[in-house]
Amino acid sequence: NNVETYANVPKIILQGADWFRTIGTEGSPGTKTFSLTGSIENTGLIEVPMGTTLRHIIYDIGGGLKSGAAFKGVQIGGPSGGCLILDQLDAPLDFDSVKKLDAIMGSGGLVVMDENTCMVEVARFFMNFTQRESCGKCVPCREGTKRMLEILERIVDGKGEMSDLDELEELANMVQNMALCGLGKSAPLPVISTLKRFRDEYEEHIRDKKCRAKVCTALRQFHINPEFCIGCGKCAKNCPAGAISGKIKHLSLIHISEPTRLLSIS
């Protein structure tokens, strides 16, 4: 059990189980503490009755997204949690409802994401965490998460293939069904949920070598705008990859190649 479980015990002892069941839902009585974070105005720890909707938490308690940004998704349940989308904001947050959405209540993490978030990178980030946290006892978790992470890293580096998506799904199902413990069984959820709800972003990374959120640096391409180039030559002089050529008072050109794509230039 965790601290949240123990915190409920004194009140149940003092006021009884019947009182406790007046809060929340029939299948998930009581309250739940969430850590509200991400692209949201009001962050912090909140305690709400089980069955409260994500919409109420994000917009009424959290104050909506920062600077009026467009909502893209919310990751629920901690590092092994699933990602939900706009159509699922009215789903009640209780154990049964969340499980049906390929997510978990988990540690109560709620990470709100806007349109500037790359969902492929989100999956890679959390898979990196769960892979490092694997105890290594069972092969499905130890090797399965490692292989999934390798594929995700290849995709965000612009080296993915369409067949990788089928392999990711197969590995995710294998780890989920064959891992020995709860961490291993839930580890693939970020990948399963993002593949299901943001598959187009995966395909863009692979097919078009494009990250719509401009987060994956390996997929950034740089161009010189002829309307603003004055032919000063400073860009060519300062380019660490030596990928810019041109004469003074003439338009400079960027030679698109692997080194150029890897530069973290805004």
How should these model regions be labeled?
Residues 254-265:
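Single conserved hydrophobic/aromatic residue that forms the stacking wall/gate
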Residues 1, 25-28, 38-40, 66-68, ...:
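Solvent-exposed alpha-helices and their adjacent loops that cap or buttress functional pockets
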Residues 66-95, 196:
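Terminal amphipathic helices with adjacent charged low-complexity linkers/tails
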Residues 92-226, 242-252:
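Ferredoxin-type iron-sulfur electron-transfer modules in oxidoreductases and energy-metabolism complexes
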Residues 238-239, 264-266:
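Cysteine-centered loop/knuckle micro-motif
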